[in-house]
Regions:
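Polybasic, glycine- and aromatic-enriched phosphate-binding surface used to engage nucleic acids
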Residues: 1-158, 205
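Non-catalytic DNA-recognition/assembly elements of restriction-modification systems
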Residues: 37, 151-207
């Protein structure tokens, strides 16, 4: 989860062998014979693979995954344990393999990304979230579902999307994205200057 940063992530140039079991009626399972180099690598672990209870149609295949297609969609990913909010946008179908990493798919992801990474969100989680006891917060799914998301019109949703797209293609930095999106969010919820100062002093911008 350490590769996950605020808004984005650092790819460690590592590849995941996804010998999936397919999706019934939609996607055929991986046939390991089509990938001799991968098979040769996995054969070194045959004893362990063949004995595991969660295998697919063959020991080479992973067990069935109902949300396999979600990994190929644009998504927000985050680690469960972090000192600050670090929600990243992944638009290219990459896998983020980590035991305590979560993903979110659906509509209006750029807007949700900006809300989740805002000082407003961090202040909220400081009140309702659980901690590890060493200064980090556990960004659990059930806690995130309690976050109140302001309703915005189509024009504003498109504006957030444009800002995030500029970040994804490298036209603006994460610092600029944070500055632009937070300013809009403060206006959406109607914060006055004193309230903005309180929130940002409570959790100063993190890049």
């Amino acid at each position: 989860g350490r590769d996950i940063k605020r808004y984005g992530y650092n790819w460690a140039n590592l590849w995941l062998i996804n010998t999936h079991n397919g999706i019934r009626g939609k996607l055929e399972r991986i046939h390991i014979e089509d990938y001799p180099a991968v098979k040769a690598h996995l054969d070194h672990y045959w004893d362990r693979m063949s004995k595991r209870a969660d295998k697919g149609d063959t020991p080479y295949n992973l067990r069935n995954c109902a949300y396999l297609e979600d990994f190929n969609k644009p998504k927000i990913v985050w680690g469960e344990i972090s000192d600050r909010s670090k929600f990243a946008f992944e638009a290219y179908g990459s896998f983020i393999p980590e035991a305590t990493t979560f993903l979110m798919v659906g509509s209006d992801l750029p807007y949700l990304l900006c809300v989740l990474n805002s000082p407003l969100s961090e202040w909220f989680f400081s009140k309702v979230g659980t901690t590890t006891g060493v200064g980090t917060v556990r960004w659990k799914k059930y806690t995130i579902q309690e976050l109140l998301i302001p309703s915005v019109n189509v024009k504003l949703r498109q504006l957030f999307q444009q800002i995030v797209e500029k970040y994804v293609i490298g036209n603006i930095t994460s610092e600029q994205l944070s500055k632009y999106s937070n300013k809009i969010l403060y206006e959406v919820v109607g914060l006055i200057d004193e309230e903005i100062e309180f929130v940002e002093n409570f959790y100063p911008p993190l890049i």
